[in-house]
Amino acid sequence: MFSLKMRASKDGVHVSGAERISTENKIEEIANSLIKRALFHENGTPDTINLKLEKITSEITYLKHIPIKTLISNNKETSRNISRNILRKELEVYFLKNGKDFGKIDILIDTAFEIIDKGNMRGAAVLDLDGNRLEEDTEKGVRVKNIDTSEELKSKILADSKLTDRTIDAIAIATKVLNFGFIAEICTSDNYSYNIGYVATKSGYFRIPNLKNEGEFGGRVFFIENSANIEEIFEKIEKTPVIVY
């Protein structure tokens, strides 16, 4: 098996990125699809496309995808409140476990929204329960690498008219991080016209329309306990090959 990674940028600003895990006979087909994805991105034609191919030498981990749930909302304010409620419910468990002040949960969620609304990060921001940024490079964030979904899951997702290719990418990321030590994730797309975002917890992957307005930036934030072994977890989300089914 091989890992393919595509990164595209324009004038040094991130435009598009994607990852796949492939058998040898599918490399050319997948490489072409990744390049096409970069060239025709709605945020602009990139001036740089990097495509990296690596043979996978370690054992692949197979993970069952977290449940996909699509919620209904007609405006950004309602969507933000929905996402806050999901995050608050999950974070309360860990604030209680760690003896943290419940009054600071909303401050933590506010910090996450500030990060995703700023946008233009290649990777994700990581926040502990005190709102501290834990990435080594806060401009780039951390990347979840060496991931893909099974062909069966891809087909299942695309058979649902409400779901898209973006759902495939997102469910792979969310499932991996929640199985490797993170508490929750919130994400909005860096595609300007795509306003569906999501919150992911172990209870599910909650798709929320209008989590941002069209034309706005997007971003991704992971939440983690203060006591977590950050170096080990970062190593796993980057290097452990995972296929989500």
UniProtKB/Swiss-Prot annotation:
Domain of life, per lineage: Archaea
Substrates-to-products reaction catalysed: heptanedioate + ATP + CoA = 6-carboxyhexanoyl-CoA + AMP + diphosphate
A biological process from GO: biotin biosynthetic process
EC number: 6.2.1.14
UniProt cofactor(s): Mg(2+)
Stored InterPro entries: BioW
The keyword Ligase is assigned to this record: yes
Pathway field: Metabolic intermediate metabolism; pimeloyl-CoA biosynthesis; pimeloyl-CoA from pimelate: step 1/1
GO MF term (any one): magnesium ion binding
Similarity comment text for this entry: Belongs to the BioW family.
Function: Catalyzes the transformation of pimelate into pimeloyl-CoA with concomitant hydrolysis of ATP to AMP.
Protein name listed in UniProt: 6-carboxyhexanoate--CoA ligase
